[in-house]
């Protein structure tokens, strides 16, 4: 993947995540642009380029699937959940106060 593709993916992800919030979207655009501008003069064979592009793609994926904005509407908040928002099944929440084993012999939350 090229830096240009990663840049575009990141800008689109910011637009999806922060749609309707001009101040936050502008700040995200400026931060993304600044980060890419700082590295624009690196030689094509620089070993730091590939990890930086991978990081940009990971951030874009995170923004699309894990950032949800809420707006206060009276005494409640309305969440703007979109088609890319990751929705978990909350299986561990449904178990309640039981001891949950994750991966090994240790109990969850030092229980």
From Swiss-Prot:
Chief subcellular location: mitochondrion
GO molecular function list: protein folding chaperone
Keyword DNA-binding on entry: no
Keyword annotations of the record: Chaperone, Mitochondrion, Transit peptide
PANTHER family hit by this protein: COMPLEX III ASSEMBLY FACTOR LYRM7
Family: Belongs to the complex I LYR family. MZM1 subfamily.
Name this polypeptide is given: Mitochondrial zinc maintenance protein 1, mitochondrial
């Amino acid at each position: 993947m090229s830096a240009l593709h990663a840049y575009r993916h990141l800008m689109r992800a910011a637009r999806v995540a922060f749609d309707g919030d001009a101040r936050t979207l502008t700040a995200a655009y400026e931060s993304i642009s600044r980060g890419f501008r700082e590295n624009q003069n690196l030689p094509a064979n620089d070993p730091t380029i590939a990890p930086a592009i991978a990081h940009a793609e990971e951030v874009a994926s995170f923004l699309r699937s894990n950032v949800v904005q809420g707006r206060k509407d009276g005494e409640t908040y309305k969440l703007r959940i979109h088609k890319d928002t990751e929705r978990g099944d909350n299986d561990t929440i449904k178990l309640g106060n039981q001891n949950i084993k994750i991966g090994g012999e240790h109990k969850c939350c030092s229980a």
